[in-house]
Amino acid sequence: QGRVTSFQEKPEPAKAKSNLASTGIYIFEPAVLEMVPSGKEFDIGSDLFPMLVQQGLPFFAQSRPFQWIDIGRVGDYWSVLQQVLAGEIASMRMPGTQVRPGVWVGLNTRIDWDQVSIQGPVYIGSGSRIEAGARIQGPAWLGHGCLMRAGSVLQRSVLLDYTRVDAGTVMDEVIASPQYVVQRDGHTTYHGQEGNSLHWGDARA
């Protein structure tokens, strides 16, 4: 903690000068942003920070105890959400109210509890509706205002806010929004795309 006098971007473990990672929230003076050249690639870690050190400009850091996870790829984002739901990420607690073992819900949800199958861990966001005959297999996350029609299935997946899953549709290990569905490998299917076997859309429509 204090002034940064040396900086390494992703060094090999044997060559690392410390065990601290450059991550978190960066706060820049406007003058620093003016140092970033236009029309070319310029990375914060590989270019800007070493330049600040080299020029002896005031550059400070704080050490914060938290768990850092890289989510630079779609698969990483999906995996982290699975870990959050499983309670494996430090200092991250499930929102909402736990109404059953492994099942958390937000406000004003409509769920036909006696006629749905929900196996946690699962979070169902505020204003969401789960119709009779729907099935959810966790870890799964449903954002605010989602709608699962009768006979729809959600398995180890994430529904972003206001996503509707239509009757008979199976969402398996995906991240879905009202406009697109992303597989773990990054393959993306868009709503209305020809040859698409999935049926979903905007719950507000």
Predicted stretch roles:
Residues 1-40:
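Conserved core of the sugar-phosphate nucleotidyltransferase
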Residues 31, 35-205:
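Left-handed beta-helix
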